Amino acid sequence: MIGRMLLFFILLIFNTACFAQKGIPLSIGISEILHSKVLGEDRTINICLPDNYNPSDSVRYPIVYVLDGGVDEDFFHIAGIVRFSTQPWIDRFPQSIVVGIGGNTRRRDFTFPVENTDFIEKEGFQKANFPSYGGSEQYRAFIKNELIPYMGNNYKTNGKQTLIGESLAGLFSVEILLKQPELFDDYIIISPSLWWGDEFLLENADKFLQRNLKKNINVYLGVPNREEDVKMYDESKALSEVIKSNKQIHFVFDYMPDELHSTVIHQAVYNAFKKLYPKTVYSKQ
């Protein structure tokens, strides 16, 4: 009897061990540390490669850059949207490398210098919440002179680039669009914080575009429910009027009344791929 019980427990342990060994790690990307001489610090770069990415073949890919791209931010769900949109039976957007830029200094990195910060409290925020700000020029230099060349030197890229930013990252995306539009081919801008600097970018948007835009680009501007933040909506709408008047820009303005500032980014990115790259016929699987 004892022998049978011992045999039973041995078999139970063996079967449990065999069952546990069947699992394999599930991974959708890699994280790298890139030292920035411009910023004087290390930055975490999260990278999701296309399914068929092969370092040995000749295929090259576009890159989708996600500004709030930490693993605890927007990297995972936006990488999922890109992978979904590039499935063979959907084929809405070309297979792409997704690059999420991680970090916890967004208020410094995504804002431009201002003479005073009185406007912060007028917007309902505390000045103490912005102990460091005004670093957008350095951050643009990091992206242009360090991150983009790094990706080009270490991964198979084809030069086509998309930028995604929401809220303060949306403000920064607008700044790049206006001041260095040649950096990206597609801009996906969501609920931008145009209030920064007493609406300086909004007031000078037309002047910047007229002076700096030298190529055709695609721009998507998505905003959530107007009643949640009337000022943000009105600022975005005013910016949309400037953008759509420029003949070099293929522009989409997307109002999403069912979304809030905290929920809008996922739906907006999905909509951006759908609206910037419309397709009506899909393969059946």
Task: Enumerate the language-model features and the residues they cover.
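Bacterial Sec-dependent N-terminal signal peptides
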Residues: M1-I24
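Non-catalytic cap/lid and distal C-terminal segments of serine-dependent acyl enzymes
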Residues: Q21-Q285
